[in-house]
Amino acid sequence: MKKNKLALALIISGLCAAGTANAANDRYIIQVDNNKKGVVKALAKKLGGDIKVDGNGFIAAQFSGHDLASVKGLLNNPHIKLIEEDQKRVPMALYNDDAGNAMQQQLTPYAVYQSQADQVTFDANAGMKVCVIDSGLDASNPDFIWGNITGDNDSGTGNWFDNGGPHGTHVAGTIGAADNNVGVVGMAPGVAMHIIKVFNAEGWGYSSDLAHAADLCSQA
């Protein structure tokens, strides 16, 4: 294997981390052992609580008009471990590409912000190579330094430099698009890349092809 190689797997998703807002509608989480939950549920209902969730080791109940201190007083019971506000959770903010026309100016892809790659400095002399296993790379795209790019073909999907759908070019661009005042600029502009085309135009590939691609990456 060559020195200082880097194989990257990028997973850009819309999964959300939790942020907090205010407690929702006087709703509280009550932690309690499962074998004592029946007693606590009965007490909560007796005191005006509306059971919303019956979970493993806890219940969530709404006590209209009661703040946290008053609910703790109402449920002064040895079986209860903890009472806390049932916080609303909101998704982590999604990042967008810079506003503008990529044909007229250079934009930064949203994933650069999402991964916080814009907060670190890229060392162009580090001897780094990134292997991208995806749907190929569009050879007609001028936003890459093609002298820094190699690839391997796949028997099922064809040449790595034939675009098998936009995803591979998008991912490769997010990683290494050139800093050339047009299109997009990647996390590591102009970085050496090795492209392996596994996913077809329908967006899928075989597990065996993916495993083989990983081996090819280690040899690139």
Each language-model region and where it sits:
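Active-site core segment of subtilase-fold serine proteases
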Residues: 102-192, 209-212, 216-220
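Short glycine-/aliphatic-rich beta-strand segments at the starts of folded cytosolic domains
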Residues: 24-31
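Acidic glycine-/aspartate-rich tracts in secreted/extracellular proteins
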Residues: 35-37, 67, 88-89, 136-139, ...
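Autoinhibitory propeptides
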Residues: 32-107
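Extracytoplasmic/secreted envelope proteins and their assembly/folding machinery
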Residues: 41-44, 68-71, 80, 168, ...
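Second-shell loop/turn segments in exported
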Residues: 159-162, 199-203
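Gram-negative bacterial Sec-dependent N-terminal signal peptides
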Residues: 2-22
